[in-house]
């Protein structure tokens, strides 16, 4: 696949099809940082849903210069992968974001958009073809950039006060069985026992501290009340690890 990068007046070849048995195509997005990034900066994979009424409108937005948004890849409903921005350039997909001590995940991540109307336009299950393609693409990227399991995140993990994607229908548990991302291994009986316990202020604070330890940011938007922000963080955690509560 050839990327004709008008901004930097160069051509980059990324032949995914030789590394993966999946269909890929190219649809150039002009929305990325002009400066090429070092491979060592790529430590995260961020999953998103497109959150638009139609797939075509999502593709148009990701490739329109006025939108000032992009991702490295988009996975269509039929499982076909569109390459939008080369991995070696910073795409504009994370926005205001934070994880652990990092503020601004764009520079350090690969962004993958998955076609889905999202919560505003009729959120639906992701198709089997989409997930199959996502698994193959993720394995390729994990191997190439040595991405750790705990560095595979959703947009809502790094921007809990702003984003809900990829949402509670995203199959994190299924992906973890393919060595993509984390999932708790605690016994279900123990989980039920713990969940039946009443939570007091002390245990609530301990729970929040553990979320911050995992990586959820203490960063606070000055316009958002602290307690409200904490609720956003808890909801982000639940969307991923306890989706049945959402």
Show where each model-derived region lies.
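Basic/polar, cationic surfaces and motifs that engage anionic cell-wall
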Residues: 118, 123-220, 232, 236-239
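Extracellular LysM carbohydrate-binding repeats and other cell-envelope/extracellular binding modules
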Residues: 243-246
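Active-site-adjacent loop/helix surface patches within enzyme catalytic domains
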Residues: 19-150
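Short hydrophobic targeting helices and cationic amphipathic motifs
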Residues: 4-5, 14-16
